[in-house]
């Protein structure tokens, strides 16, 4: 399943969070990271993930909870969404 995570730094945690990221804390065990994107000039970004184990996403978010706010959304590709809509419309 695909997921999109939106992250944003909590107030005053940018420096500590970036230090953790640069030290390798951005690794995402148990999850295929399709891409991680950073909004220029801001303190937020997005991660596109693929996994059959949402517990791995929960664990990673919990490890970063001191520094980041998270919003995790399961998403479908156009092909997957099309199949669902086709069933509804049949």
What annotation goes with each model-predicted range?
Residues 1-90:
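Conserved, structured core segments of small domains
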